[in-house]
Structure formats: C-alpha cells, structure tokens
Amino acid sequence: MSMIARWHFQAKFGHKQEAIALSKEWDEQIGKQTDLDFDGTRMLSGSVGAKEAEVQVEFEIDGLDELQTFFDKIASIKMHEDWGKRMGEVIVSGSTYWEVFRIVD
C-alpha cells in the first residue's frame, strides 16, 4: 500500500533558506544512506493561507514498516545527530512533526 510520509518544520525568522539548504543537504548526505528512494521527494513552503515559515518534505513509502525501518536506520547514523544540532539552530524548537497519508488514487 503506497503512502506519503510528510515531515513538517518551521524555520526561524530570517533562516528559511538556510533551513531549506540543510534539508537538501540531509537528502544528499544522510537520506542516501537509507533504503528509501528520495528521487521523488518534494519540498513545500508556506505561501497563501499557510505560515510563511512552514516547510514540508514529503516522500512516498510502501507502508508504516518501511517508515519505521527508515527511522531506525537514521537513528544509527552519527552524521544525522550532528546535522540535527545544526538544523536545530535555524528551526523553531518543537515545530517538527510527521504526518502519513494513504494514497487512494
């Protein structure tokens, strides 16, 4: 069953481009160390009717087991911990969360 996993964060004022750059860096350096295919990853940014600071990263997964395997894998990558500290400097603390959607059509 195909699903969309979407990670949300809000950039601190004046740091949105830096947060986006760090997210792209994560895709290239850390995401590629996982078994997920990040070629179809999309990054969305708040515009009309959404918070301007909002950034969302979404990618397709086969199911919740694949997402859990992904979480387990990134937890074991030292570079992910270091990246998280840098990302924490440019995003609003407590603003990150995940959503998962089923693809129905």
Regions found by a protein language model. Name each.
Residues 2-10:
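Active-site-flanking beta-strand signature of metal-NTP-handling nucleotidyl enzymes
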Residues 3, 49-53:
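Short glycine-enriched loop/turn motifs at secondary-structure junctions
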Residues 11, 56-59:
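Pocket-edge positions in alpha/beta enzyme catalytic cores
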Residues 25-42, 50-51, 58-97:
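An amphipathic, aromatic/His-enriched active-site/gating alpha helix that lines ligand/cofactor pockets
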Residues 96-105:
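Long, low-complexity, Ser/Thr/Gly/Pro-rich intrinsically disordered segments that act as flexible linkers
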